[in-house]
């Protein structure tokens, strides 16, 4: 079987930089793996180096449309292993793992936040926003260099909407929900069907067929709750019939209204 190659690659998406990157050893591995992945038509999502049961280097990758198949992981492993052996960024024995981002994936690029608008996320900030660093809620739209989030569990009278600067995000992950699972399955089926057509296993679609786009989410746009503001109390009426009768009686008796002349 021919190694799969992502078709009709969006070059802008492919070259889009990550907002969340690794420090130290992870950064050294990313410097080697990133260009190889991009040359193959894939994007680097995350590098994770762990020392449990020996050293494991996990490289999370995806197609520019956010999908990833088992065949993609195999192709990346075959291409990347010899390059890492020569560059030797780890400098000790390790086990290489190539994986997809998973359903509850990390969000590391602007396009990730755009693609998953309307889904439940958890975000940890490197810099506190409004006195807190951890947020969980519905992902809203991007506003310039920040993303809007409708927090869960906001108190009565508290604005649940938080504007989080993208450059200050330490980590952001989707939260597993039924809607997210359904969306992930939909995208996976589209990617698998396209790969089979590339390999000639399936015939091409008829010219009039509507092509599904895995980069477009089926999630409804997030309806961010509005801040709950306490309504100001209306002042009591001052020109009722009772007020006019009382004023006339005071005038007859030669009394003055203490509020007059204010």
UniProtKB/Swiss-Prot annotation:
SUPFAM superfamilies: YhbC-like, C-terminal domain, YhbC-like, N-terminal domain. Keywords: Cytoplasm, Ribosome biogenesis. It is found in: Cytoplasm. Its main location: cytoplasm. It comes from Rhodopseudomonas palustris (strain BisB18). The lineage of its organism: Bacteria, Pseudomonadati, Pseudomonadota, Alphaproteobacteria, Hyphomicrobiales. InterPro entries: Ribosome_maturation_RimP, RimP_C, RimP_C_sf, RimP_N, RimP_N_sf. Residues 197-262 are annotated as: Disordered. Required for maturation of 30S ribosomal subunits. This is Ribosome maturation factor RimP. It holds the Pfam family DUF150_C. Residues 240-254 have a biased composition (Basic and acidic residues). GO terms for cellular component: cytosol. Residues 223-233 have a biased composition (Basic residues).
């Amino acid at each position: 079987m021919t190694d799969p190659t992502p078709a009709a690659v969006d070059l802008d998406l492919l070259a889009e930089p990550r907002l969340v990157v690794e420090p130290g050893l992870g950064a050294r591995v990313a410097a080697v793996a990133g260009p190889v992945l991009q040359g193959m038509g894939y994007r680097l999502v995350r590098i994770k180096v762990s020392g449990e049961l020996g050293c494991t280097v996990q490289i999370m990758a995806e197609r520019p449309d956010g999908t990833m198949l088992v065949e993609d992981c195999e192709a990346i492993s075959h291409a990347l292993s010899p390059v890492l052996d020569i560059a030797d960024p780890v400098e000790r024995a390790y086990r290489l793992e190539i994986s997809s981002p998973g359903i509850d994936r990390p969000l590391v690029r602007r396009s990730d936040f755009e693609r998953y608008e309307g889904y439940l996320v958890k975000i940890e900030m490197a810099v506190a926003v409004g006195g807190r660093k951890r947020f969980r809620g519905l992902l809203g739209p991007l506003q310039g260099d920040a993303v809007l989030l409708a927090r869960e569990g906001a108190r009565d009278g508290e604005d649940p909407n938080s504007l989080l600067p993208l450059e200050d995000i330490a980590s952001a992950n989707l939260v597993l929900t039924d809607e997210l699972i359904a969306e992930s399955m939909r995208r996976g089926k589209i990617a698998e069907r396209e790969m089979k057509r590339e390999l000639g296993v399936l015939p091409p679609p008829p010219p009039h067929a509507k092509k599904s786009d895995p980069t477009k989410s089926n999630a409804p746009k997030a309806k961010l709750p509005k801040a709950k503001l306490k309504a100001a109390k209306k002042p009591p009426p001052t020109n009722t019939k009772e007020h006019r009768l009382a004023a006339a009686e005071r005038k007859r008796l030669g009394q003055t209204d203490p509020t007059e002349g204010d």
